[in-house]
């Protein structure tokens, strides 16, 4: 009996991927500090400026920056991990990635300059300084995602977790000071968002050596495996996740600043299940990896079904919680008023998005990159059609945004489910699950 218990304990330890706890702590810290940052902005800014910073700048940054740079980070980590397994230095890979990041950032900055007027008037409520904040954020997030790849690829998940947690803390501290000091300039709060990524990176890289070792020359193909599909899918997924507040901010009239501010606060409150979702993944996915690695494919399929059921359960809890406690929480923390029905709709959309994200990551793990990207595109098309139809029917702005978001996420999930079932019939190789773990455990969804 004692030997059996010892074997079970050793198996449990092996089942937990290296760095899970470090990254988990970083995620927890950044989650808490992010919501505290939202509270500071809600309390310190006018409703118009709050809508501009949190309803305009924040989602735009987190659609474009992670959408464009996270796939590059993932490919760096994958390539370096492969080289490390063969005792080959990855310096040339990182240099290739730096060149790609430089060109990509330059292109994004050029587009920002071209469309600066559109951004200022439609998303930033006439605050031109927020365009500068957005440009700074592109630079700092490019500078952050570039070292995150070598940290992940070299198994340095402690410093990786430090980046996640430190960014949230560095962002919150000056914002809290601005709030308590009575500063109401939205650009000041925008800089609190734009600058911290590079500071967090510098902090995490202190004392790190051997991240970029010399090695054989790296062809572009070593870095660009499925990069196009990863990039497209990442941008589409991040864009869909923030679509409700981006659309509401753009379509709202000048007399709806208070409603937009309340909607933005409710939207982020409804995203709390995403944090619970990541905790569930951290607990269950290692077990799935062990089952697949042992060739127990039927057990793997059963485990994946359980994961989907748990995701649905988390979504249901989120909807009920939003309906019952949501209005009270929004009033308490953000000093905004929003109905439980609206919050429940937003929570339902977030739950459907989580389900779609889970299925997308499983598809990618089974080398279904193109299928995942196409699924995101189809779902977004469904949402766009729904939004146009609801607008033609003169449905109230926020309700049509909520319904379109929900339908888009459900559309993505439905298409992915069909494609995933077909993909799994061909078998579940163990290396696919390793890719799934790498994609979820160490490449978290950007809040």
Predicted regions and their residues:
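Interhelical loop/hinge segments that connect adjacent transmembrane helices in multipass membrane
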Residues: 2-14, 158-162, 182, 186-192, ...
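Helix-loop junctions and terminal segments of transmembrane helices
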Residues: 69-85, 266, 270, 274-295, ...
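Membrane-water interface segments that mark the loop-to-transmembrane alpha-helix transition
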Residues: 14-30, 34, 56-57, 69-117, ...
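Hydrophobic alpha-helical transmembrane segments
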Residues: 128-133, 161-210, 378-382, 396-423
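Small-residue hotspots at the loop-to-helix junctions and early N-terminal turns
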Residues: 48-55, 59, 131, 257-272, ...
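Transmembrane helical elements of multi-pass membrane transporters/channels
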Residues: 18-38, 166-167, 171, 189-204, ...
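Interfacial segments at transmembrane-helix termini and the short loops linking adjacent helices
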Residues: 47-48, 116-133, 257, 323-351
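Membrane-interface junctions at transmembrane-helix termini in multi-pass inner-membrane proteins
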Residues: 139-162, 342-375
């Amino acid at each position: 009996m004692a030997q059996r218990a010892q074997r079970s304990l050793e198996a449990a330890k092996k089942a937990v991927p290296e760095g899970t706890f470090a990254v988990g702590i970083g995620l927890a810290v950044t989650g808490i500090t992010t919501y505290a940052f939202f509270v500071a902005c809600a309390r310190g800014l006018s409703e118009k400026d709050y809508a501009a910073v949190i309803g305009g700048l924040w989602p735009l940054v987190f659609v474009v920056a992670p959408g464009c740079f996270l796939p590059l980070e993932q490919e760096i980590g994958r390539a370096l991990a492969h080289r490390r397994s063969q005792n080959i230095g990855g310096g040339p890979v990182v240099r290739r990635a730096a060149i790609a990041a430089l060109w990509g950032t330059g292109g994004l900055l050029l587009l920002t300059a071209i469309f600066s007027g559109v951004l200022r008037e439609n998303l930033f409520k006439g605050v031109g300084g927020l365009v500068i904040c957005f440009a700074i954020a592109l630079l700092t997030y490019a500078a952050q995602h570039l070292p995150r790849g070598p940290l992940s690829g070299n198994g340095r998940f402690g410093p990786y977790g430090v980046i996640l947690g430190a960014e949230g803390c560095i962002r919150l501290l000056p914002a809290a000071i601005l709030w308590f000091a009575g500063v109401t300039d939205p650009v000041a709060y925008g800089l609190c968002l734009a600058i911290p990524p590079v500071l967090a990176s510098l902090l995490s890289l202190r004392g790190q050596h051997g991240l970029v070792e010399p090695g054989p020359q790296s062809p572009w193909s070593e870095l660009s495996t499925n990069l196009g599909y990863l990039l497209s899918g990442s941008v589409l997924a991040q864009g869909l996740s923030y679509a409700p507040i981006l659309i509401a901010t753009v379509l709202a009239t000048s007399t709806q600043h208070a409603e937009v501010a309340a909607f933005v606060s409710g939207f982020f409150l409804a995203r709390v299940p995403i944090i619970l979702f990541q905790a569930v993944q951290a607990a269950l996915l290692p077990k799935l990896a062990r089952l697949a690695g042992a060739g127990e494919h039927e057990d793997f399929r059963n485990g994946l079904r359980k994961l989907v059921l748990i995701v649905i359960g988390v979504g249901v809890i989120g909807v009920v919680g939003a309906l019952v406690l949501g209005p009270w929480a929004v009033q308490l923390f953000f000093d905004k008023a929003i109905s439980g029905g609206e919050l429940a709709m937003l929570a339902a959309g977030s739950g459907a998005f989580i389900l779609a994200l889970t299925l997308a990551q499983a598809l990618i793990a089974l080398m279904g990159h193109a299928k995942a990207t196409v699924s995101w595109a189809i779902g977004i098309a469904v949402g766009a059609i729904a939004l146009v139809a609801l607008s033609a029917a003169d449905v109230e702005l926020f309700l049509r945004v909520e319904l379109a978001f929900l339908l888009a996420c459900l559309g993505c999930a439905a298409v992915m489910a069909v494609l995933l079932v077909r993909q799994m019939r061909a078998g579940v190789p163990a290396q696919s699950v390793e890719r799934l773990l790498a994609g979820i455990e160490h490449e978290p969804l950007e809040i």
